[in-house]
Structures are given as C-alpha cells and as structure tokens.
C-alpha cells in the first residue's frame, strides 16, 4: 500500500472518529435537518424517504436528488451524509462531486450490484457501511470504509437485529483477541477477511474504525442499550420524525447517548415523549423483506 493511500485512509478514519459519541439522524428536508442540528445531532443523513417509508412504498430505492441534498447542506453547519446503492460507484461519484461529508453504501437502498461493493479507497470522501458480523465489517474496511455500523433492520423500530449484530461482533472480537497467531490465519480464511485486519483487531480488541449502532433504534433506552453494548454512537432513522414529538425525541436520544450509563437521566429523558413510531417486529418480516441480508 502506498503512503499516499495509507495517509488518505488514516485521514478518512480520523474524520469518522470525530463523530464518536454522537447521534446521526435521518432527515428528508431542510426543516428536519435544522431540528436535528438544534437537538444536538453530530451529523444528518439526507434522504428522500426514511427506511420505514421505503418499506411501505416499495419500488426501487435510489440515491436522493442532489438538489435536495444541497438544500440540507445549506441549512446546517454539521456534516451531511447521503446514501448510495450497494455497488453503485457512479452515485458515489456524484455525491462526492457535490461535497457530501460522508457516503453510506447502504443496504436500505435497492442494490445496484449483487456481487461487488464499491471500491471505496478510490474516493476522497469517507464511507460508512453496514455489517452483521466481523467478516462483513473487515471486508468493507479492506475496500476502504472509514466507519462501520450495524445493519440492524432499518425502518422497523425494532432494535433486536441491531442488538444481535452488535453481540455477534463483540463475541467475535473477544474470540480473536484470545487466538494464537496460527489460529488467526485460519480464522481469517474462515470469515473471508484480510489477515492484516484480523491481526489488528486481535491487538486492539475492537475494530480499527468507529462502529455505530443502526437499524431499529427508536427510543432513548434503545440508544443507551446500544452504547452500553459497546457501540461508538448511534444512527436514528425513522424513529424520530415518524414519532409524535420529533424535536423532543431527538433531544432525548442525544442526551441518552451522552449519559448512557446514568439510569436517572435516562428515566428523565424518556418521560412524555409522545407516541413512538408504530414500527413492525422483525419476527413478522418475511425473508424477502429483510434488508440486512443485502450485501455480503
């Protein structure tokens, strides 16, 4: 790896580190973006439909209109992220050209390539990608991802899959930390991950990039749960702006992530939030409805 590429990778991972301990909120217009910023969000994710609406409306979900993203960029001073379809490197080129701060190669959108993910190391802008386990996370990092998030099951309001993916990841990290050098080679082959990244995880006891929770986080308690399980921050999608009082819920989730180990504050911020999003239990989804299975 050349020094130039390595430096770029380090810079991008460093930019993602700056979001650690924060909440990233899905927004569909400038007004929502301003609400998110006022509530204390560390970044916003600009998209035309939140995941719950993508589920309900069906059809092909694509990159958002660049003009909408530009309106959100103009409305706030915090970083603006946007989603592209898995494998759609031209959508990524477009988003980079308009100056988005991070790109999410997202399973929430309809995949453009069912075999290949984007070669993210070619881009200057940092990428975030979803994963269900250590193998998926390290494959995305090897492609150039600067940030990982759980896939969870977006648009459901059910946190169970995000919990499952986080516990899976933490368990695998504990396992590699206890392995001998020769066992690491075998395990790297088993999970189809580069050995240098597996070794780095063994040394660090964690991923070499930040790892956020995403998919089904709908309440302050959900957010605090994911932080206590070891996540570095939280993405909240449909759970805020499909709830009864979005501004209050947004503030509450930000405080919950900051004070995730303080039950008294968590109780305080959980009071009188209005109705949570109705949601849908993951157990009621048919296999074809599950978004987390997209990608490899």
Curated annotation (Swiss-Prot):
Pfam families: SOR_SNZ
GO terms of molecular function: amine-lyase activity; pyridoxal 5'-phosphate synthase (glutamine hydrolysing) activity
Presence of the UniProt keyword Acetylation in the record: no
Record keywords: Lyase, Phosphoprotein, Pyridoxal phosphate, Schiff base
Record bears the keyword Phosphoprotein: yes
Residues the record marks as active site: 83
EC code: 4.3.3.6
Residue sites binding D-ribose 5-phosphate per the record: 26, 155, 216, 237-238
Modified residues (Phosphoserine): 178, 180, 283
Gene Ontology, cellular component aspect: cytosol; glutaminase complex
Listed pathway(s): Cofactor biosynthesis; pyridoxal 5'-phosphate biosynthesis
InterPro entries in alphabetical order: Aldolase_TIM, PdxS/SNZ, PdxS/SNZ_N, RibuloseP-bd_barrel
The reaction(s) this protein catalyses: aldehydo-D-ribose 5-phosphate + D-glyceraldehyde 3-phosphate + L-glutamine = pyridoxal 5'-phosphate + L-glutamate + phosphate + 3 H2O + H(+)
Disulfide bond positions: none
Record-listed D-glyceraldehyde 3-phosphate binding positions: 167
Annotated GO biological process: amino acid metabolic process; pyridoxal phosphate biosynthetic process; pyridoxine biosynthetic process
Listed HAMAP family: PdxS
Function text: Catalyzes the formation of pyridoxal 5'-phosphate from ribose 5-phosphate (RBP), glyceraldehyde 3-phosphate (G3P) and ammonia. The ammonia is provided by PDX2. Can also use ribulose 5-phosphate and dihydroxyacetone phosphate as substrates, resulting from enzyme-catalyzed isomerization of RBP and G3P, respectively. Also plays an indirect role in resistance to singlet oxygen-generating photosensitizers.
Family as reported in the entry's similarity comment: Belongs to the PdxS/SNZ family.
NCBIfam families per the UniProt record, alphabetical: PRK04180.1 (NF003215), pyridoxal 5'-phosphate synthase lyase subunit PdxS (TIGR00343)
Protein name per UniProt: Probable pyridoxal 5'-phosphate synthase subunit PDX1
Gene source species: Schizosaccharomyces pombe (strain 972 / ATCC 24843)
């Amino acid at each position: 790896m050349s020094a130039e590429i390595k430096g770029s990778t380090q810079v991008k991972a460093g930019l993602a580190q700056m979001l650690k301990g924060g909440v990233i909120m899905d927004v569909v217009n400038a007004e929502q973006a301003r609400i998110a910023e006022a509530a204390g969000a560390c970044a916003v994710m600009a998209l035309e439909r939140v995941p719950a609406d993508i589920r309900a409306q069906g059809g092909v979900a694509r990159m958002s209109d660049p003009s909408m993203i530009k309106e959100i960029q103009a409305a706030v001073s915090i970083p603006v992220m946007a989603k592209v379809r898995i494998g759609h490197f031209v959508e990524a080129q477009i988003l980079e050209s308009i100056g988005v701060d991070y790109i999410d190669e997202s399973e929430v959108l309809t995949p453009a390539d069912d075999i290949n993910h984007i070669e993210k190391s070619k881009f200057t802008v940092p990428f975030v990608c979803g994963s269900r386990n250590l193998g998926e996370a390290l494959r995305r990092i090897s492609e150039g991802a600067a940030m990982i998030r759980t896939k969870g099951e977006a648009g459901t309001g059910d946190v169970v899959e995000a919990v499952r993916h986080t516990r899976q990841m933490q368990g695998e990290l504990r396992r590699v930390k206890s392995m001998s050098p020769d066992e690491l080679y075998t395990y790297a082959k088993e999970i189809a991950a580069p050995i240098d990244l597996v070794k780095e995880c063994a040394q660090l006891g964690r991923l070499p990039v930040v790892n956020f929770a995403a998919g089904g986080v709908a309440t302050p308690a959900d957010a605090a749960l994911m932080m206590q399980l070891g996540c570095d921050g939280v993405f909240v999608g449909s759970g805020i702006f499909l709830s009864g009082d979005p501004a209050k819920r947004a503030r509450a989730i930000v405080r919950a992530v900051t004070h995730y180990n303080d039950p008294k504050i968590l109780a305080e911020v959980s009071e009188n939030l209005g109705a949570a999003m109705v949601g849908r239990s993951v157990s009621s989804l048919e296999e074809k409805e599950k978004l987390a299975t997209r990608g490899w």
